[in-house]
């Protein structure tokens, strides 16, 4: 924080640090599975409240679903100052990559947050995009997770040629 930091930026920073502290506390006191379930519920609720209306507000309604989802994360995170990159491979496959240092787990907190927390929020948000868009063929494939000491959080939205079972909506393919 600098002397030119606005009060709203200070408040946002404090809330973010509190959120990180809560994740650490819950994982230590209650266990990594509990923090994962908590993150799932938190992000699922936010997704249900914000995703569809925001897709419209951001002008993404008419795009292919995989592309719209990737662009959504770039635009919605960018509003809050979170750096996300996007690449459209095809109409049915679009990539997102969160730039380092990753805002979600900044500083040394990344060393104490269990991977279940990250997977909980991916399951609560990324895996639900197809459900919300009423597209049962849309899923998210995570190719890298910063909490597993890979190169950061990166993956792609993909529209398959078949309906996905709930457990297929979020996949991990680090190789």
Predicted regions and their residues:
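N-terminal accessory segment detector
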Residues: 1-95, 102-121, 131-175
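Metal/cofactor- and membrane transport-associated sequence elements
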Residues: 125
């Amino acid at each position: 924080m600098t002397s030119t930091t606005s009060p709203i930026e200070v408040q946002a920073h404090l809330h973010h640090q509190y959120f990180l502290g809560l994740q650490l506390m819950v994982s230590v006191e209650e266990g990594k599975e509990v923090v994962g379930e908590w993150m799932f519920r938190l992000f699922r609720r936010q997704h249900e409240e914000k995703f569809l209306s925001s897709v419209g507000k951001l002008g993404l309604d008419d795009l292919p679903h995989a592309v719209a989802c990737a662009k959504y994360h770039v635009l919605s995170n960018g509003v809050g100052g979170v750096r996300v990159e996007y690449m459209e491979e095809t109409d049915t496959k679009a990539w997102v990559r969160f730039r380092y240092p990753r805002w979600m787990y900044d500083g040394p907190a990344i060393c104490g947050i269990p991977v279940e927390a990250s997977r909980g929020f991916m399951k609560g948000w990324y895996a639900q995009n197809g459900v919300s868009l009423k597209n049962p063929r849309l899923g998210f494939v995570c190719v890298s997770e910063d909490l597993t000491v890979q190169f950061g959080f990166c993956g792609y939205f993909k529209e398959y040629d078949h309906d996905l079972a709930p457990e297929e909506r979020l996949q991990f393919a680090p190789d």
